[in-house]
Each structure stands twice: as structure tokens, then as C-alpha cells.
Design a protein with these regions (language model features):
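Auxiliary Fe-S-binding modules of radical SAM enzymes
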Residues: 1-33, 64, 68, 98-109, ...
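Nucleotide phosphate-binding site architecture
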Residues: 21, 42, 145
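Canonical Radical SAM [4Fe-4S] cluster-binding loop centered on the CxxxCxxC motif
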Residues: 25-62
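Small/polar loops that bind or transfer phosphate-bearing groups
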Residues: 36-37, 114, 249
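Glycine/Thr-rich phosphate-binding loops of Rossmann-like dinucleotide-binding domains
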Residues: 44, 88, 147, 218, ...
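Core AdoMet radical
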Residues: 49-65, 72-123, 129-165, 179, ...
Length: 271
């Protein structure tokens, strides 16, 4: 049913576009991740399956269609993410904010998480989304500092950290939960992973997801290492020991993996 509704509403889900391996599990739990602002990204990160090129024109009706779909499906948790839209002055922040606002109007019980780009450091864009009142703000660091410029040539490691820091500072919701995610298997070391975790904790990041990098095609960055389940367990323990409220680590873990569960854990967290 969810796929039918998404298709009929002319919506994109990152579950499909990014070929997420957990699509069935999340949809069964009334959690879905919607990819707004089209299906074409203005950047060309060498790990990502989403197509790149010149995006389509802005669809101002998208927030209402998305909210109607969320309401009809009775979702418990909706994640809103997007392609990068560096062609737009605000990076698409207005549409992000409208999506949150429309969901709030139609299904107030649904928790909303936003997984945003860096908006090239435009804090007005970031603030406009925070004013709409998401429950969780997510921005992925993706990889360790050394490898970052190799796979995210148009991004910046320190800017990504600053986005997470600014989200906490700008939000009027002092209980805002922040979250980030990273891939492993790109050639990083254990020490580099730990350093990235420490960097994220320095900007008060609450939640962390860690998954195995899976090469979308032979044109993308090769896999340097396959992590074992035990190694993922060690990474989860490392993150929890460093103070994250919840760490989801595993071969098939992605940013939105059990997002509703992560949010509940953080919301009920006590030291």
C-alpha cells in the first residue's frame, strides 16, 4: 500500500532511490523516508546511488502531497530528506520547512525527522527548517576526515560538524535531538572512526548510525573492507562509551534504520 500511495502522489522515497536494503522492514513499521526536491542531485558523491545532473523545477505542491500521504498511511514516523539543490538560493529549505508544517497540521501524532544537506553553510536556510519544529535533526558526516574530500568533493567535513552544532544553537526546541551517520569500509582506521565519533560528540550529537558501505555500481568508490558483525558490535560499544544516547551499527544499517526507535531512546535518555 505504501508504495502505491507514494507512486500515486508522485513522491520519491530514499528507500527506493538509494536502494536501501531495509525497505520492507521500515515500511512494515509505519516508518518511511521521503526524498523531496526531485530525484536528481547537483553533487556527485562517489559513494551514492542517487542520480546527478540538472534538477527539475521546484514543485511547490510537494509538501501538501507528502503530508496527505503521511496522513492516509497513518505513519508513526516520517523522515524527510533530499537531494542537494545547490541551484536554489536557499538549497530547498523552504520546501523542507513546508513539509514539516503540513505534516504537523494533518497528523500531529507523527514524529518528523529531517535529514538535510549542508546548505553550503546558509544558516538562514537551516533556521527556517528548525522553526518548523522537527523532532529530530539529522545531518550525515558520512565518513572520517581523511576520506571525506575523496568521496564528497563538494562537501566539507568541518562544515558538516558546524551544521550539527548550529542546529542545537538555533533551535528554539531545547530538547531537539540531533543525529548523524557514517559508512565504514572505505579504508578508514579504528582510530579515525573514534576521532570522528569524538568530533560529533563535541558538537553535542545525540544519535549515531554506522553501516557498511555498499558500492552501488562499478563506477563508484570500491569497497576497501567488509566489517564483521562483531566489529560492528565493537563500534556500537565505542560510541555508547563516548556518550551517544543511541548507536545503531550493523552491515545494513542506514541513516533512517529504526529511526523511530532511536528517537524514543534519545527522548527517554537519562544519565
Amino acid at each position: 500500500m505504501l508504495k502505491t500511495m507514494v507512486d500515486s502522489g508522485n513522491l520519491n522515497t530514499v528507500c527506493e532511490e538509494a536502494r536501501c536494503p531495509n525497505i520492507g522492514e521500515c515500511w512494515d513499521n509505519k516508518t518511511a523516508t521521503f526524498m523531496i526536491l526531485g530525484d536528481t542531485c547537483t553533487r556527485a558523491c562517489t559513494y551514492c546511488a542517487v542520480k546527478t545532473g540538472k534538477p527539475t523545477s521546484l514543485d511547490l505542491e510537494e509538501p501538501l502531497r507528502l503530508a496527505k500521504t503521511v496522513e492516509t498511511l497513518g505513519l508513526n514516523y516520517a523522515v524527510i530528506t533530499s537531494v542537494n539543490r545547490d541551484d536554489l538560493p536557499d538549497g530547498g529549505a523552504f520546501i523542507f520547512a513546508q513539509c514539516v508544517t503540513q505534516i504537523r497540521k494533518r497528523l500531529p501524532t507523527c514524529k518528523v525527522e529531517v535529514l538535510t544537506p549542508d546548505f553550503e553553510g546558509n544558516w538562514n536556510s537551516l533556521n527556517s527548517i528548525l522553526l518548523a519544529g522537527p523532532d529530530t535533526f539529522n545531518h550525515n558526516i558520512e565518513t572520517v576526515r581523511r576520506i571525506f574530500p575523496v568521496v564528497r568533493a563538494k562537501g566539507d567535513y568541518d562544515l558538516s560538524l558546524k551544521v550539527l552544532k548550529k542546529a542545537k544553537e538555533l533551535s528554539t526546541n531545547k530538547s531537539l535531538i540531533t543525529k548523524s551517520g557514517m559508512m565504514v569500509g572505505l579504508g578508514e582506521t579504528q582510530n579515525e572512526i573514534r576521532e570522528t565519533m569524538i568530533d560529533l560528540k563535541k558538537v553535542n550529537c545525540d544519535l549515531l548510525t554506522i553501516g557498511q558501505y555498499l558500492r552501488p555500481t562499478t563506477k563508484h568508490t570500491p569497497i576497501a573492507k567488509w566489517y564483521t558483525p562483531n566489529e560492528f558490535s565493537d563500534l556500537e560499544k565505542m560510541g555508547l562509551d563516548l556518550g551517544f544516547k543511541h548507536v545503531a551499527a550493523g552491515p545494513l544499517v542506514r541513516s533512517s534504520y529504526h529511526a523511530d526507535e532511536q528517537h524514543r531512546t534519545a527522548a527517554n535518555y537519562s544519565v
